[in-house]
C-alpha cells in the first residue's frame, strides 16, 4: 500500500491478464463508469479509468443544482449560475499521483438552456456528475492497474483496497448478454437539408460556425454494456465512454477532445475534416493528401482554430496561447482526421471549469465570432484540478426501453451542404449496421 498524502492511498497490481472491460464487469456497485482510450487510435491516451459507488451526485437544470449525498441519503438544492455552483461544490484536494485523474467527478455537461443530448422525447439535466472517491486506473503502457482512494472528509475511514484488488482479479462475471433494437424515428434527410441550408444562409460575422444535432430513436432490449462493447470494437476512437446514471446510461465514442487542463497548462485539439481510411497504405496516403489539400476543409479548419485561440485567450495569458501543431492528420481505425493542437497558460485566478465554460459556451468573454447550435461534452474533473472532456459527437443514451442516438454536424460558410448530407447518411447507415450483433436488429 502506498500513501501519497494523508487523504490518498494507492495500491498497484499486475494487470497483464486484465482489461478495462474485464475490470468493469467484475467491479461491484452502482453508477459504474468506464472511460477508455483506444489502443488502435494513433496518439490515444495512456490510461483508462473505471469506478463505481460515487460519494455524491450533482444534477444541474437551469440555475439550480441538486446535490445527492449517498453517505447521508439527503438531497441539497443550490441556486445560482451553473458553472459558479460547480466551482464552489466540486471538492478540491491536492495529491501527488502521477495520473491525470485519481478521483473526482465524471459526467456530462451542455451549455446555456440545452442539455448534452437534444431530444424532446428524453429529459436530461444540463449537467450531471458523479463524484468518486475510489477509482481504478489501467495503464496501457505498463499493463499495471492502480487502485486509488481519496477521502473527501479527512476523518473518514479508508476502504479496503486489498479487498477491491481481489474483486477485480478473481471476481465473478455474468454470462455474455446480447441486445436488440427496433428503429422508430429519425430526422429525415429532407428536413435536415432544409435546416442546414437555412442556417448556412444566415451565417454572418457574429455566428460563423453551426453545430447541429441529428437524432434517431429505437426500441431497445438487452444489455447496454453489450451494446457498448460492440460499438468500441467496430468504431474505436481516442475517447470511449460508458457512464451509468440513475435512470439512463450514456455511451459512445468520439475522436475529438474539447479541452484538457493539467495544472496551469491548457490544451485544445480542435478537429475539422474527416475522410475514410484507405484499404492499402498507398490509398491511405492518397486519402490523406486529398483531405489535406481540400480547400473548403482547410478554410473551415482555420476558422475553427482561430475561434478556439480566441476562447483560450479569454482564460489564459493571451501571449501564451500558441498553435503547437497545425492541420495534422491523425489516424483512427476507420478514419483520418485533421486536427490542430493549441496550448496556453491558465490565468492564476481562474479554475479549470472556467476553461470548460469558455470553450463549450457559444458566448464567451471574447468578441470573436462564435458557434451556434447544440452539443455537449463528457469527461472528468479531478480532485487535483485536472480536467479532460471530449465532445459527445456520436452518443447513445439508453433511457428505460428506448435508445436515443445522436450525431453532431459542424458547418461553416465554406461547407458543401450536399457533401455533408451524403456523409451523414452514409455514417448513419454504417453506424446502425455496426450495432447489429447476434441479430441485434429485430
Task: Please annotate each region the language model reported.
Residues 24, 58, 107, 136, ...:
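A residue-level signal for conserved active-site and pocket-lining positions in enzyme catalytic cores
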Residues 45-59, 209-298, 314, 319, ...:
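An anion-binding catalytic pocket shared by soluble metabolic enzymes
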Residues 10-14, 23, 146-167, 260-333, ...:
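Cytosolic ligand/metal-binding cores
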